[in-house]
């Protein structure tokens, strides 16, 4: 289940549903002898799942580190859960999801929420934050490339980069 409908996400024929806590624990028990990491991403927005906090706690109990990929729209709502999760290793934020949807907020509001979350994570935790942006593409529409340019300029300004981060 996702709160967006991005054009770049693959469609599926299966019914939309959330992974429940019982099934998640079963999967954790199956994979924990084989890995130290799990990844919550693809085919849905992990921050939308009502069991997120339990998932993170159960992973911690088993010594599993969690990496999450999100569209970033629910970071503010889930901030406390994420900041307090002892299992959370990395949060990847797909910035390109904003342009693929009609949103009730402006890009600036969305991006400021993302940056505010990253600032707090950097000040208070060891969690890694990664902003993802699809590369410039001559075949893409002018609007997509213009938003990429806007995002990279904002990143350059926020973090004081003198060189373009896209180079």
Regions found by a protein language model. Give the residues of each.
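Conserved alpha-helical substructure of the radical SAM core
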Residues: 1-91, 102-109
């Amino acid at each position: 289940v996702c709160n967006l409908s991005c054009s770049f996400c693959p469609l599926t024929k299966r019914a939309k549903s959330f992974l429940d806590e019982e099934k998640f624990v079963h999967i954790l028990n199956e994979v924990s002898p084989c890995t130290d990491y799990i990844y919550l991403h693809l085919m849905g927005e992990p921050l939308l799942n009502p069991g997120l906090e339990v998932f993170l706690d159960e992973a911690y109990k088993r010594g599993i580190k969690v990496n999450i990929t999100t569209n970033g729209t629910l970071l503010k709502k889930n901030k406390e859960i994420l900041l307090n999760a002892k299992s959370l290793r990395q949060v990847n934020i797909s910035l390109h999801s904003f342009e693929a949807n009609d949103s009730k907020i402006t890009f600036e509001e969305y991006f400021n929420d993302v940056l505010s979350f990253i600032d707090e994570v950097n000040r208070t935790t060891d969690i890694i934050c990664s902003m993802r942006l699809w590369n410039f593409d001559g075949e893409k529409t002018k609007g997509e490339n213009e938003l990429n340019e806007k995002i990279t300029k904002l990143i350059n300004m926020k973090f004081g980069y003198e060189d373009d981060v896209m180079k």
